Amino acid sequence: MAALSPTFATSTQDSTCLQDSEFPVSSKDHSCPQNLDLFVCSGLEPHTPSVGSQESVTFQDVAVDFTEKEWPLLDSSQRKLYKDVMLENYSNLTSLGYQVGKPSLISHLEQEEEPRTEERGAHQGACADWETPSKTKWSLLMEDIFGKETPSGVTMERAGLGEKSTEYAHLFEVFGMDPHLTQPMGRHAGKRPYHRRDYGVAFKGRPHLTQHMSMYDGRKMHECHQCQKAFTTSASLTRHRRIHTGEKPYECSDCGKAFNDPSALRSHARTHLKEKPFDCSQCGNAFRTLSALKIHMRVHTGERPYKCDQCGKAYGRSCHLIAHKRTHTGERPYECHDCGKAFQHPSHLKEHVRNHTGEKPYACTQCGKAFRWKSNFNLHKKNHMVEKTYECKECGKSFGDLVSRRKHMRIHIVKKPVECRQCGKTFRNQSILKTHMNSHTGEKPYGCDLCGKAFSASSNLTAHRKIHTQERRYECAACGKVFGDYLSRRRHMSVHLVKKRVECRQCGKAFRNQSTLKTHMRSHTGEKPYECDHCGKAFSIGSNLNVHRRIHTGEKPYECLVCGKAFSDHSSLRSHVKTHRGEKLFVSSVWKRLQ
């Protein structure tokens, strides 16, 4: 909703300044300023006061009040509109330079509390003209916004409102009003009821008035030069610029943490309060504010009121929707000052900055090892815990998590109808077979644009390119082994997560499952069940037979990421990589990957 402030309403036929004779000054003493030597919304020419001295605008001039009987009649949407208007009015006064002390009403609204009865009626004694028993005060709130009285049906007389009635249609719906009411009524019979100096917003000069009026006609005159985002007020632009500059002028007095917006500081200050009076009836979690409890309840109810207009995806919190929308717009407002890299979310920038600072905020309480990323820390913690193992029923292989076992099960479930005629290997489809055939023919169709090296598989080319870009590697938090991608490291972590429960009675070695122990026992018995069809040579382990067969087929699936040379077995590749040591700084990371 646009920023709303109570303003003077003028007829389209008469937009001139109001005369003093239209405003009889009561002899009673009250706090509403009757005469201000300022520009007002009802006219653009200065007006000279005839009575009294110049007075400043107070919060009472822009406040709307409710009695104890009227407040319960408002529904939640009406109360929300009341809160938004009051907070925005107070913000407008302070941003325009008025020295306005914070009323207790504003303090309660900022704390997500309902205003107390005495605070809602605190302003009623200030202006005798506000006593209107024939209508509710929320009608006055709508008069502030639209310049008309709603329940009795007052004419829509504000200048330029006729063209914008559709723009404010949703507000009429909120208050159950008919936007086409035209019966002329007012607070004072025979006079324009809204041409009142004691009830409106006044400005020191034309620039302030122009800025204020832009909030009503939808103009956004203040544009950010960095991202071209536009705002209706300069104060909003100033707050937005802090995202780019990193300025955080609002500091917490308790812990020293700084923020770029006062509302963020207020939310943070509540974390220091020990009292959490709002309890969740379903899970027992406690919260400091009622609004926080309401947001939390969406976890249980499944309510997702914030929906994306482009893809229809819904979220339980507005901040999550704002972050999601950046995936459509491509906006990356959070920029790193060290390298210039931009991010869509502040948490992503925070994690990225650790690459420059070397900060490792996640420390293990058991062994003292520190980590830069929370994901690595969580994986490391599992090393200290006894994890349940997930074993494959088909082959007996065990995994540290259910997801890894599910991925492994595809090996047994998926049929492999395509067979290689040279080595007898089977594959799921022709494209995989075609890539495999390159290991027999020696064809290397995937060439590096930077150094000209060629590879038989596209995945090997992708891994090779990381040598040129010095792309960050994925290191195992438990043993330090380095991997070229996240999935490879995740598969490797199952080695550390799975408890070795089966022990060999002859040599004392421990293994993860019975199938691994069974293979190991052949080293003691001398059994060699795997025999080569070409030469009759036998092996105790099936993988050794597979390596041996490559001698007959000529298959060389292991390629060097540095020079592209291929080998039939992994150990030969490891020996070859040692010859590159000293040639390039990146070879050390390649060597680590082969350990």
UniProtKB/Swiss-Prot annotation:
Main location: nucleus
Tissue spec: Isoform 1 and isoform 2 are ubiquitously expressed. Isoform 3 and isoform 4 are expressed only in lymphocytes, spleen and lung.
InterPro entries recorded: C2H2-ZF_domain, KRAB, KRAB_dom_sf, Znf_C2H2_sf, Znf_C2H2_type
Annotated Pfam families: KRAB, zf-C2H2
Key words, A-Z: DNA-binding, Metal-binding, Nucleus, Repeat, Transcription, Transcription regulation, Zinc, Zinc-finger
Subcellular location: Nucleus
Ranges annotated as C2H2-type zinc finger: 222-244, 250-272, 278-300, 306-328, 334-356, 362-384, 390-412, 418-440, 446-468, 474-496, 502-524, 530-552, 558-580
One function term, GO molecular function aspect: DNA-binding transcription factor activity, RNA polymerase II-specific
Domain annotation KRAB: ranges: 57-128
Matches recorded under SUPFAM superfamilies: beta-beta-alpha zinc fingers (SSF57667), KRAB domain (Kruppel-associated box) (SSF109640)
Disordered: annotated segments: 109-128
Record's function text: May function as a transcription factor. May play an important role in erythroid maturation and lymphoid proliferation.
Family under the similarity heading: Belongs to the krueppel C2H2-type zinc-finger protein family.
PANTHER family in the record: FINGER PUTATIVE TRANSCRIPTION FACTOR FAMILY-RELATED, ZINC FINGER PROTEIN 628
Name of the protein in question: Zinc finger protein 317
Annotated gene: ZNF317
